């Protein structure tokens, strides 16, 4: 599948589950002084999560253009270190505004990945927040994932917060092993090794982080998911680098023609912040 087909497939999948398509919002947020750039698909829905406005619909799907170069969600130091982080990327997402919650989010994500796109189940891993027994049980009851591939992780990896303040909650991530040897997979590699790519983050927004650091319950529980189009395109197109997909190659080919030089993928040898524990 090319990138346009993947984007269209994602949107149609959720439209068929009664989601309303919402266009990508500007990369410079409107009326949100807490953000320099739009860094996630949920930014435009923040007033809904905070109960400041009423939602026009209870379910939404879109593909959001994002920039991450500063703040809490900053990928700048990862760019060039690996082949799957970018300052600009496209986030596929589906949302529930006080409608469905964890059960549907998990079930539909697995359905899309394994039935529609037919990703190899033997390469997929799921993580949940360490205290989220509900999400853990749903993964093992609703899907046919190997229970040993459902991992409990801490706040750093599985409690999502948009910024220092604002909507937040536990999350469940789906990771994909891109290595050559399936037998070399280990649970200890998830969230650590670059052989395991985070493809989709299912966020269960139920709290609001206040300036003093405390949490208050939101008036309703919501679902906010984000999946990287570039990474999914890499997997579905049988590549090992985002730069070798149809999203980047036309640009690279044009640069080659102008520069009169051939493209070679060379990564920095310095350790990434992930490897150095930062």
Ranges and model annotations:
Residues 216-219, 266-267:
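Active-site-adjacent structural elements in folded domains
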Residues 268-275:
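Conserved small/polar residues in nucleotide/adenosyl-binding loops
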Residues 86-90, 117-119, 211-214, 229-235, ...:
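Short acidic (Asp/Glu) and glycine-rich catalytic loops that position anionic groups and cofactors
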Residues 1-97, 147-214, 221, 237-240:
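Class II aminoacyl-tRNA synthetase-like tRNA-binding/catalytic domains
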Residues 177, 191, 224-235, 239-263:
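Internal glycine-rich alpha/beta core junctions
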Residues 2-6, 102-105, 135, 248:
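Hydrophobic (often cysteine-bearing) scaffold residues that line and stabilize catalytic clefts
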Residues 100-155, 175, 179-181, 255-262:
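Conserved, charged catalytic cores of large soluble enzymes
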């Amino acid at each position: 599948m090319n990138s346009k087909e993947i984007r269209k497939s994602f949107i149609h999948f959720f439209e068929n589950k009664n989601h309303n398509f919402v266009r990508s919002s500007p990369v410079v947020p409107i009326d949100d002084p807490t953000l320099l750039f739009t860094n996630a698909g949920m930014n435009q829905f923040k007033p809904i999560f905070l109960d400041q406005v009423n939602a026009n619909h209870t379910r939404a799907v879109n593909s959001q253009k994002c920039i991450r170069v500063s703040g809490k969600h900053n990928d700048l130091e990862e760019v060039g270190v690996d082949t799957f982080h970018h300052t600009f990327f496209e986030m596929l997402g589906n949302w529930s505004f006080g409608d469905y919650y964890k059960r549907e989010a998990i079930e539909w994500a697995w359905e899309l990945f394994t039935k529609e796109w037919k990703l190899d189940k033997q390469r997929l891993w799921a993580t949940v927040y360490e205290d989220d027994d509900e999400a853990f049980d749903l993964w093992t009851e609703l899907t046919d994932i190997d229970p040993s591939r459902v991992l409990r992780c801490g706040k750093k990896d599985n409690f999502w917060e948009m910024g220092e303040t604002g909507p937040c909650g536990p999350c469940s991530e789906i990771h994909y092993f891109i290595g050559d040897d399936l037998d070399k997979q280990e649970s200890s590699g998830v969230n650590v090794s670059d052989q395991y790519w985070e493809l989709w983050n299912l966020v269960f927004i139920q709290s609001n982080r206040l300036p003093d650091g405390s949490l208050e319950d939101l008036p309703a529980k919501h679902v906010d998911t984000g999946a990287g189009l570039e990474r999914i395109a890499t997997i579905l197109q049988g590549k090992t680098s985002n730069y070798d997909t149809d999203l980047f190659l036309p640009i690279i080919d044009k640069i080659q023609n102008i520069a009169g030089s051939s493209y070679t993928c060379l990564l920095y040898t310095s350790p990434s912040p992930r490897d150095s524990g930062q």
